[in-house]
Design a protein with these regions (language model features):
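Macromolecular interaction modules
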Residues: 1-124
């Protein structure tokens, strides 16, 4: 399993609510269109300030952590080739320009290691 992680920042002037609304009602569907048949999971995780008392939401370097899981390198390569096609790029870039600060986009593939944790008792 290969995971692609992308850190994305909303375009200046776009509120957090507007950003999430557009991503979840429009941009997500573009992603699903080009990832279908290649990816096994596609998630968006919207960042919030963990210590709101000492940090303003505007201090976050990114607004969303996007994760895409592929069953292997061939599936990821095929998806990336499709996404790189001229017709896909026209659609994707046009929407990204409405939504993201494109200069700040960062993508990484990651190796995951998971720890099994003991069960937490209810009410803890």
């Amino acid at each position: 399993m290969i995971k692609l992680v992308t850190l994305l920042t909303r375009k200046p002037g776009l509120s957090r609510a507007e950003f999430i609304e557009h991503y979840e009602t429009h941009h997500r569907k573009i992603g699903e269109k080009y990832l279908s048949g290649f990816a096994v999971k596609y998630q968006r995780r919207y960042l919030t300030v963990a210590d709101a008392a000492n940090h303003a939401p505007s201090e976050l370097p990114f607004d969303v952590l996007m994760e895409i899981w592929f069953p292997g390198q061939p599936a990821m390569d095929a998806a990336m080739a499709l996404i790189a096609s001229e017709s896909a790029q026209e659609e994707i870039v046009a929407d990204e320009e409405r939504l993201f600060d494109r200069d700040s986009i960062r993508s990484y593939t990651v190796e995951e290691y998971e720890s099994e944790m003991p069960a937490v008792e209810a009410g803890t």
